[in-house]
Amino acid sequence: SSAASDVYKRQIVLLVVLFPANIFAQERRDKEQTYVLENPYEVNKITPLQGKKIKNVVLMIGDGMSLMHVYSAWTANRGKLFLDNCQAVGLSKTYCANKLITDSGAGGTAIATGQKTNYHSVGVDVEGRPLKSLVDFAVGKDKSAGIAVTCRLWDATPADFCCHNKDRDAEAEIVADYVNSNVDYVFGGGAKLFENREDGRDLFKELRDKGFQTPRSWDELVKIKSGKVFAGPYPV
């Protein structure tokens, strides 16, 4: 019948469309998918000093890094990583107060303050109230505290330790909080939001007025041996 013929034609067309995909999928399965690090780097084993009080604590955050990322690197480097020398490792449950999937704002706030907060929030609780971070607790115990990042300073992860805002996208507002934070040393990018601002503020000048040195290049930074430092050499 005509109807049966139409169905048959549709089936033929469907097979023509799908069959090549099955072939390609088989080719992908048959092809070996491997990565080989030809020159793995050496990892020195560091033995912790026994009986001595720890002076410095470094918190390393691989933003978005999961156990699988670490395991992949460990496997590629023949079962050795400098991370193996870390004496303490922590895990964060990656959900925020109002969403199942977090972002760097809420996720970083949990690490920095020990409290869950809303999606996109930076250093504030679910009501928008500022939270004390590890930086504040360190200074409260007469310790110095600093942050050094490979991103812009208004990015949520570094901002979680020094700034307070309900919206991580309020970048100009966020960087202004560094002026009144308790941090002693800062290194990161994003200098363009510290000067030539729409509100007319020069945040580098305000930081200098508070006793910070504000080197704008790597050469200037390495010459500084003491004192409070706010280094923003990268304008991006």
How would you describe each model-predicted region?
Residues 1-8:
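Short, small-residue-biased leader/transition segments that mark boundaries at the very start
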Residues 9-26:
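Bacterial Sec-dependent N-terminal signal peptides
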Residues 26-197, 203-221, 228:
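N-terminal catalytic scaffold of extracellular/periplasmic and nuclease hydrolases
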Residues 226-236:
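Acidic/His-rich catalytic or pseudo-catalytic neighborhoods
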